[in-house]
């Protein structure tokens, strides 16, 4: 009796493993033109810090991040951030970048696209450990590639604590105001897929890497113990970055299913160099609450 029961249990386990192993996914439709290239995101957490001027670092900034298509080739974009928590303040700390990008060329290719099926995050406060688990597959899809030229305005205000040898000048305001110009490469995908159990779902993403030259003529009048000391000047900088837009489609293109908060995320990462800030990192997350075509 016990032997038969054990054999039945083993059989059920093997059957469940076999069923799970046989679960497959297939692409039923793919068209990157269905994806929404434009977005308006509420930026709820961004860090913006220059490593040569940590006094001017923003530990927590909020704002908006947007891209709006004027036509098939021309798009305008803007990033506006206000610092809620800075290491030092000398006036309001903010970053504002606004410009446009123009499509130079585009092509569509068949690619294997990674699709995230599930993600889970757990924190064990007792043992102070974190566990992340996810499941993903690669599915065939059409990917649109677009080369763009870009340019615009770049303005940032923060604090500056300038040091020279063993001389530490008074904390003052540092304002970057100038322009950027560069190139970008937009990759867009949208697909519909079906699992072997019949479940249907949509997936897609927009990835926007770019590289810019920053022309920021910056002049700072330094003071030492409240008295005028010297004037310093720098002009050139650069940045390279990427914006990743998850789920660039609406409920209508998602089998009439609501898209969750984190699935509607916009991730941004910039690295580069700014006058007197040196090497800098700007990175954060936004909630994509409006999508545009």
Predicted features by range, described:
Residues 62-64, 98-100, 179-183, 238-242, ...:
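Membrane-embedded beta-strands of outer-membrane beta-barrel proteins
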Residues 18-43, 109-137, 292-293:
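Sec-dependent signal peptide cleavage junction
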Residues 96-111, 277-293:
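Outer-membrane beta-barrel "beta-signal"
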Residues 21-79, 83-88, 156-162, 286-293:
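Short glycine/proline- and aromatic-enriched beta-strand/turn motifs that initiate or cap beta-hairpins
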Residues 5-17:
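Sec-dependent N-terminal signal peptides
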Residues 24-35, 40, 146, 154-276, ...:
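Outer-membrane beta-barrel transmembrane domain signature
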Residues 50-61, 82-93, 230-236, 266-284:
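Solvent-exposed loop/turn segments connecting transmembrane beta-strands
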Residues 74, 79-213:
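Gram-negative (and chloroplast) outer-membrane scaffold detector with strong preference
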């Amino acid at each position: 009796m016990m032997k038969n029961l054990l054999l039945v249990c083993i059989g059920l386990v093997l059957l469940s493993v076999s069923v799970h192993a046989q679960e497959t996914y297939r692409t039923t439709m793919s068209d990157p033109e269905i994806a929404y290239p434009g977005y308006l995101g509420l930026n709820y957490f961004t860090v913006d810090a220059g490593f040569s001027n940590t006094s001017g670092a923003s530990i927590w900034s909020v704002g908006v991040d947007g891209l709006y298509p004027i036509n098939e080739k021309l798009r305008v974009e803007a990033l506006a951030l206000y610092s809620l928590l800075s290491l030092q303040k000398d006036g309001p700390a903010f970053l504002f970048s606004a410009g446009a990008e123009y499509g130079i060329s585009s092509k569509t290719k068949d690619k294997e696209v990674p699709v995230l099926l599930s993600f889970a995050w757990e924190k064990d406060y007792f043992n102070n450990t974190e566990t992340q688990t996810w499941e993903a597959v690669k599915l065939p899809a059409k990917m649109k590639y677009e080369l763009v030229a870009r340019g615009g305005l770049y303005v940032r205000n923060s604090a500056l604590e300038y040091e020279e040898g063993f001389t530490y000048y008074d904390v003052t305001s540092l304002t970057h105001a100038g322009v950027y110009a560069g190139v970008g490469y937009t990759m867009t995908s949208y697909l519909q897929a079906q699992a072997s159990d019949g479940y249907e779902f949509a997936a897609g993403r927009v990835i926007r890497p770019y590289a810019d030259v920053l022309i920021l003529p910056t002049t700072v009048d330094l003071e030492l113990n409240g008295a005028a000391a010297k004037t310093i000047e720098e002009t050139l900088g650069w940045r390279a970055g990427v914006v990743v837009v998850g789920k660039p489609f609406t409920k209508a293109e998602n089998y009439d299913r609501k898209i969750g908060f984190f699935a509607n995320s916009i991730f941004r990462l910039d690295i580069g160099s700014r006058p007197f800030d040196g090497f800098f990192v700007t990175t954060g997350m936004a909630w994509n609450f409006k999508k545009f075509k």
